[in-house]
Amino acid sequence: PFFFNDTATTEIYTLSLHDALPICNAGAGEDVDERAIRKNGVFAMTEFKPIKEGKVREIYDNGDSLIMVATDRISAFDVILKNKVTNKGKVLTQMSRFWFDYTKDVLPNHMLSVDTADMPEFFRTPAFEGRSMKCRKLTMLPIECIVRGYITGSGWASYQQNGTVCGIHLPEGLQESQQLPEPIYTPSTKAEIGDHDENISYEKSIEVLEKQFPGHGEDYATKLRDYTIALYKKCAAYALSRGIIIADTKFEFGLDENGNVVLGDEMLTPDSSRFWPLEGYEAGHGQPSFDKQFVRNWLKANPDSNYDLPQDVIDKTIAKIGRAHV
């Protein structure tokens, strides 16, 4: 089920994917204008040109701000797949919008607006509506801040081998998908497209940050860890009250013009998080998920796919990502 907070009425709605998008997008549920998009899913570069093209998002310079556009591309294992998932970019943007607003009392974030009326005219088309976010400019910190509340995925594989997750020793006897006694912080480096992120210790994160920001490494590392845990606890409690388990997630932070740590990038989307249904949850095995874990599992089972998904897998991915929508 969806749980969507309409800030105009503060009411909670339970929606299907097709019902949710028009409400979230304020009437921008039209089909994306394919004339504005190249075949590989990258938006046409005419008046505005992306200054950065990530695995899923494209970032445009807007003078004193940035426009971050979420495409319908999907990535897995640090590779961009050949397929697109219809409306995925809209879902990611609207989920981030909700969570940025929900957690603004914990720390500031980079979101300024998701209304294309607040953006240059170039972005006021169906191709960009619902999937674009106007953001503050930040100096991004070179750490991906991962927090795990449940043991699963690569963490479970590591625990089975040596009783640790990213170098953190955990109690004996844990089961797959079991909730951890306390959430654990497992940072990683940020890899370029095609490369793999590297898990690092908290101590190593201090070194990485100190190298780029002399005299501030430990201070920034501590803030990243503490903010990451605080954000996870607040959001996991809310999601649980709506029937969703947030097993783990990733945050990214940057610095504003005054050197303050600010939350950036995306927040608690199916691309950055594992969402499980609370109903039917039981530790001891893998869980059904409302995220792209379904795609990862299919790719593992089909190593010769050349990262090309069949239509039925794409359709199921659309349904699963839609059910996670906030």
Tell what function each PLM region has.
Residues D6-L21:
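Short, small-residue-biased leader/transition segments that mark boundaries at the very start
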Residues V147, I246-M267:
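Conserved metal-phosphate-binding beta-hairpin within the catalytic cores
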Residues Q161-N162, L170-D219, M267-R323:
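Anionic ligand-binding catalytic core segments
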Residues K211-A247:
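A long amphipathic alpha-helix within ATP-dependent nucleotide-binding catalytic cores
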